Amino acid sequence: MISVIHTGPYGVNTLIVPLSGPYDFVVDPACCSQCGDERAVTSFLKNNSYIPLAFILTHGHYDHVAGLPVMKEAYPEVPVLIHEKDRERIGKSGFDFQSADIAAAGLSSLAEVYKNLPESDGNLTDGSNLYDCLKESGVNAGNAEAEEALKKWSVLWTPGHTMGSVCLYNEESEEFISGDTVFYGAWGRTDLAGGSDSLMADSLKKIYRTVKDSALVYPGHDYCGFELKEFFTFLSRF
C-alpha cells in the first residue's frame, strides 16, 4: 500500500511506494526546515526500516522539490529522477527558477531551501519503466525482486501543468500517481510558468486512453485513493 505524508509548502502528498521487502521509492519529497517538517520523510523511512531506491519528481515546481536537500543529505547515494524538460528547475540552475516562483507566490522566506538543490541523476522518459530509467542513470537496485517491481511502474509524460510533468502507472496493481495533472474533481493549473491549456487537454486524453478507469489515483495534493473514473465523470461535465 502506498503511504502518504503531507509535507512542505501547500501540504504536498509525498508518496512512499513499496516495491519488495524494505525497498521503496519516494515521490515528491517536500519536507523542509522552513516548514517545520524536515525530518518527516526520513523519520518515517527509518522507523519502518525502509530503503529508498529513488527520489522521483512528478515535476519541478518549488512545492514538490523542497525536500530534496534533506533527502540527499540522509541518502546521498539515492538518485533523483525528473523529466528532462523540468530538469533545469533543480541543481545549479534551480535556485534562479525557484526564487522567481516563490517570490511571485509571496513566499520569499523559503528561498534558503533552494540554494542547494541536488542535480538530477537521470531522466523519466515517456514510455519507459522505472527500472530502465534507473538503469540508464547508472543505478543498480541491487535486489532482483525490487527490480521486477520497478519494471511494473511506467512513466507517462503529461505536459500541461509544466513542460516536464509526468505521471506513473502500475497496470498490475491499478495505481496511478498523477502529480499535479489529475486531482479529485479538478485538473492541474495551466496558468503558471511552463503551463499550457492545449497540452493539458492532450495529456488528459492520453491518460484516458492509457490508464484503466478503475485505477486508484494518488495526486500531488489533497484527496488520494479515488478511482480514475470519478475524475473522468467530473470532466465529462465540461
Model-predicted segments: where are they?
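Short catalytic-loop micro-motif centered on adjacent basic/acidic residues
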Residues: F25-D28, A54-I56, V155-W157
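Short loop/turn motifs at secondary-structure junctions
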Residues: P22, I51-P52, D213
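Conserved beta-strand hairpin/beta-sheet module of binuclear metal-dependent hydrolase folds
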Residues: M1-N48, L168-G179
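Beta-strand-turn-beta hairpins that frame and shape the catalytic cleft
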Residues: M1, V17-D24, N129-S154, N170-E175
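Active-site HxH/HxHxD metal-binding segment of metal-dependent hydrolases
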Residues: C31-C35, T42-E148
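Short Gly/Pro-enriched turn/cap motifs at secondary-structure boundaries
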Residues: I5-T7, D121, W157-P159
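Metallo-beta-lactamase
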Residues: C31-S33, F97-S99, E136, A146-F238
